[in-house]
């Protein structure tokens, strides 16, 4: 890797000497799935220096150990002499620079996991999730710099939200981009290949859309619909958008995996056929990730920027960051004209019933769910449904709850939009920082002019079910409880190779009491061979207190269990207009 790369890099380093950090990114053999990275460092104190690879990607709250993909780390001085490199921790390398004035660190990154948060390279395209590709100089994340991308010979297009540098290399087809600090670089993905690119402009912000992969999308339709979503979102914040340019990178693949937000871009991963029957889901995803350019990238907990890339960054406010965003990603489709009011109420009802019908909702407060995202939310196990509650859905319901409180408080003249504007102005515009948990509550109380301890004690730090009818009834929505106690087995089943397998056991259920566990194979019930549908039908005909005998296989041992059927009531609600407070109802579900 040294020879030709080193000669070119030393020449380029001289050309960009005004910059303190420069990266060269190559992909000479994409079939091997390796990005070749050079990190050129200048203007540092003589002696040792340390470079580090982040262990996580902001917006995805899991330590992913990106350094596991790094190989062949080498370093050279400005004369081409090799310097000693030693690893000092799982994600750090110390370079013995001595009296060197410039250091060129070279390494390879294996990239063969295509997701919105991990990098990928093959003969069809390259995707760079920057947190897992670019190292930083320890103690100097504030250094500005440039990145030069040298595409594989068959790749014609480079898409990134980074600005082009004023000085470019002379090598054909390469492009150089600039960044003010490492936080901006790591927040800027790259799509490199032959993606289809189009653009549209809304309120003076240019939006570039890069579509990788074939699909049943219609560009003319996307331009119109994505622009309407963007317009609706700008209106939430008084028509103001902090970006002059914004980039969508869309991966159209077999198995779509959601999205990841960045300050002036997003990466979306969707099923390539989603633009048919699942088109509104795609628009909801667009709305969700775009909303993050305000909520989480600028309106944010103080822990979420500037980041510590070496370890977890804990906050108990993800229910606001992701939850409020989830609330808006469907509400905005009403405002943009893609959902009717009735359709939206059915959507909100579904979210409400998912939340309150979850066993884990009575166990894990949403503040704890936020804080434990690193160890529970992103690392679920077979018991997670019994003990955890997603901050996405619970936060969305709490967002709707607060929206109703605000609309009622101000008699249909203000809503959650105005509180979001208030947070943006008070913390991002005036202070340019995030807020603490106490500051968030204080801001809400100041905005509303009332104490909100009950809300945080009961619903954020507690697990109580709110009186939804009382709150939503004031904005014209009746909430009727529809939960009923039924005889329940309490285990979810799947068919695997003809075998009836247990994939979930509800806490406190008849199945759990009998000793049934996830992973058990159910061979027969009351001496009758069954598959999963037959078993569900059989136990569904039993009454409270009646029993059945299960023959199961566990770890290749045969066991017999007796199940005594019990009652279970899953909370459920129905939402429908109640005919009152029509002005507030119409204000809530207004269109642009």
Please report, for each region that a protein language model flagged, where it lies by residue.
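Bacterial Sec-dependent N-terminal signal peptides
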Residues: 1-22
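Early extracytoplasmic/domain-onset interaction patches
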Residues: 19-56
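Non-catalytic architectural context of zinc metalloproteases
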Residues: 63-72, 76-229, 235-243, 255
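Extended catalytic-interface subdomain
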Residues: 320-341
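A generic structural motif
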Residues: 42, 76, 150, 551-553
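Juxtacatalytic substrate-recognition/specificity segment
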Residues: 39, 196-318, 324, 328
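Hydrophobic residues positioned within well-ordered beta-strands of beta-sheet architectures
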Residues: 21-23, 35-39, 103-105, 145-147, ...
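C-terminal recognition in membrane/secretory proteostasis and scaffolding
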Residues: 329, 339-592
């Amino acid at each position: 890797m040294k020879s030709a790369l080193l000669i070119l890099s030393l020449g380029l380093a001289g050309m960009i000497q005004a910059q303190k950090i420069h990266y060269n990114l190559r992909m000479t053999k994409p079939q091997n799935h390796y990005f070749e990275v050079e990190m050129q460092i200048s203007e540092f104190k003589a002696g040792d220096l340390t470079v580090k690879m982040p262990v996580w990607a902001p917006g995805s709250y899991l330590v992913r150990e990106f350094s596991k993909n790094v190989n062949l780390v080498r370093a050279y001085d400005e004369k081409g002499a090799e310097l000693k490199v030693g690893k000092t921790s799982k994600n750090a390398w110390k370079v013995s620079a001595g009296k060197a004035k410039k250091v060129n660190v070279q390494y390879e990154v294996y990239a063969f996991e295509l997701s919105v948060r991990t990098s990928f390279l093959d003969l069809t395209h390259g995707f760079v999730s920057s947190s897992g590709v670019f190292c930083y100089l320890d103690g100097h994340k504030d250094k500005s710099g440039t990145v030069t991308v040298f595409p594989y010979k068959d790749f014609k297009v480079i898409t990134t939200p980074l600005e082009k540098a004023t000085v470019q290399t002379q090598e054909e087809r390469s492009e150089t981009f600039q960044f003010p600090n490492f936080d901006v670089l790591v927040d800027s993905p790259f799509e490199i290949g032959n993606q289809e690119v189009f653009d549209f402009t809304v309120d003076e912000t240019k939006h570039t859309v890069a579509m990788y992969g074939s699909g049943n999308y219609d560009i003319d339709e996307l331009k119109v619909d994505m622009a309407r979503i963007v317009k609706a979102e700008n209106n939430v914040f008084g028509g103001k958008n902090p970006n002059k340019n914004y980039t969508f990178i869309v991966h159209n693949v077999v198995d779509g995996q959601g999205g990841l937000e960045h300050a002036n871009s997003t990466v979306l991963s969707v099923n390539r056929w989603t633009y048919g029957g699942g088109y509104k889901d795609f628009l909801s995803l667009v709305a969700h990730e775009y909303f993050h350019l305000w909520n989480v990238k600028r309106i944010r907990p103080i822990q979420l920027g500037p980041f510590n890339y070496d370890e977890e960054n804990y906050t108990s406010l993800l229910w606001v960051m992701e939850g409020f965003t989830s609330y808006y990603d469907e509400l905005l489709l009403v405002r943009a004209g893609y959902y009717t009011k009735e359709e939206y109420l059915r959507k909100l009802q579904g979210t409400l019933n998912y939340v309150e019908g979850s066993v884990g909702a009575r166990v894990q407060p949403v503040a704890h769910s936020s804080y434990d995202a690193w160890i529970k939310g992103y690392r679920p196990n077979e018991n997670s449904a019994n003990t955890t509650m997603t901050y996405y859905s619970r936060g969305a319901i709490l967002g709707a709850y607060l929206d109703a409180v605000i609309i009622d408080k101000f008699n249909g003249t203000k809503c959650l939009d105005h509180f979001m504007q208030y947070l943006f102005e008070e913390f991002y515009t005036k202070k340019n920082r995030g807020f603490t948990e106490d500051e968030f509550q204080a801001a809400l109380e100041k905005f509303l002019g009332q104490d909100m301890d009950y809300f945080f004690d009961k619903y954020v730090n507690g697990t109580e079910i709110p009186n939804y009818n009382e709150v939503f009834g004031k904005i014209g929505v009746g909430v009727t409880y529809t939960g009923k106690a039924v005889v329940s087995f309490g285990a979810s089943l799947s068919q695997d190779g003809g075998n009836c397998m247990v994939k979930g056991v509800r806490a406190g259920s008849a199945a759990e009491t009998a000793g049934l566990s996830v992973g058990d194979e159910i061979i027969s019930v009351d001496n009758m061979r069954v598959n999963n549908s037959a078993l569900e039908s059989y136990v569904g005909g039993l009454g409270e207190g009646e029993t059945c005998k299960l023959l199961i296989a566990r770890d290749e041992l045969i066991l017999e269990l007796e199940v005594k059927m019990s009652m279970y009531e899953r909370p459920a609600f129905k939402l429908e207009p109640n005919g009152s407070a029509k002005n507030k109802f119409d204000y809530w579900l207004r269109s642009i």
